[in-house]
A protein has these predicted regions:
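Helix-loop junctions at the membrane-solvent interface of multi-pass transporters
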Residues: 29, 58, 87-88, 155-156
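Membrane-embedded alpha-helical transmembrane segments of multi-pass integral membrane proteins
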Residues: 15-22, 48-51, 55, 74-84, ...
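Interfacial segments of alpha-helical transmembrane regions
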Residues: 2-14, 58-79, 148
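Transmembrane alpha-helical insertion/packing segments
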Residues: 1-45
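C-terminal TM-helix exit segments that contain a strictly Trp-centered aromatic cap at the helix terminus
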Residues: 22-27, 77-92, 109
Length: 160
């Protein structure tokens, strides 16, 4: 029988992988090229998803709590990234000297997996509204939801 914490982590993984899937559909079907901060958020979503899957299908309460804590920390990093994209980077003519651009280029992921991590737009050009709300704010909202979903995993009581 799975615990509530394991089910929460599995749901977190589903949300995060779903967010990346939606981002890829936006990019490849609706021709919305991503900026450096967009692809960095994809990386954070994938990291959360993997960590959450390990905790959701791994064994033991300690591993589940550690994975919950890592998920919460990564979600907090995602909140910062999405907020920076919305409040600062989206108003810059170029984001080629920001942390996200240097980090993504430095990892080599943009060249190794360009269909997923390729940087094809400036942050200003990548500003898109969906249902009247900027894409970065949707991402920020999901990171906040994931953060609060991970907290009961970390601080909850034993196996329930």
């Amino acid at each position: 029988m799975t615990s509530r914490s394991e089910r929460l982590l599995r749901l977190i993984a589903l949300f995060c992988f779903g967010a990346v899937g939606i981002a890829l559909i936006s990019q490849h079907v609706f021709d919305m090229p991503p900026c450096a901060w967009c692809v960095m958020q994809r990386l954070i979503y994938l990291a959360i998803g993997i960590v959450a899957l390990v905790g959701g299908f791994g064994g033991g309460r300690a591993l589940t709590r550690v994975c919950g804590a890592l998920s919460a920390l990564l979600a907090a990093a995602g909140v910062v990234a999405a907020w920076y994209q919305y409040s600062v980077a989206a108003k810059m003519l170029s984001c080629d000297q920001t942390f996200a651009d240097r980090f993504m280029s430095g990892t080599g992921l943009d060249g190794a997996v360009p269909w997923l991590f390729g940087i094809y737009a400036t942050c200003m050009d990548a500003v898109v509204s969906v249902l009247g709300i900027e894409y970065a704010l949707w991402s920020l909202a999901l990171f906040v939801i994931v953060f609060f979903m991970a907290l009961p995993v970390v601080f909850g009581r034993g196996r329930a």
